[in-house]
């Protein structure tokens, strides 16, 4: 993960995770106001299409389902740890926060619920449609998010489906600064 900004970056650093996930922050001066941007990539599930593709054999499908559950449980545990680290970091921030990234979690998850308890979901504030950003398994799901502090207002939220840069479409959000 990385940051690119046309505005001055005042400070930057990493947020330590003890697994394959990654998180970093950058404090940026925007029109005289310091804003903390946090970029996150939570632990991946490392799934392959063959693991989720159903077959005509019910026994094989049952075995696949059990295998997926065994694979999911340790990742969910790592997500819990990573999200608690993020939540603590956000709560200690002296500046307004914009948090964005690949959470590898759907909107009815522990991860989403925990972060939406300290920041607002920009899609709910200014988005329309489904906001599905992951497209690789032909199952459109929303696992990429942009959250912000209450004193920042998102004015436009869009998933740009014209750009296939990876297995995720880019998410674009415009903000206005509240006084």
What are these regions (language model features)?
Residues 50-53, 77, 123:
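Short acidic/polar alpha-helix capping motifs at helix-coil junctions
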Residues 1-50, 146, 158, 162:
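Structured beta-strand-rich core segments of catalytic domains in phosphoester-bond hydrolases
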Residues 14, 80-81, 88-97, 103-179:
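Metal-dependent phosphoester-hydrolase catalytic domains
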Residues 48-52, 109-112:
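Short aromatic-enriched loop/helix-cap "lid" or pocket-rim segments at secondary-structure transitions
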Residues 39-42, 101-105:
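Short, well-ordered beta-to-alpha junction loops that form the rim of enzyme active sites
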Residues 18, 71-85:
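Soluble or luminal CAZymes and related metallo-dependent hydrolases
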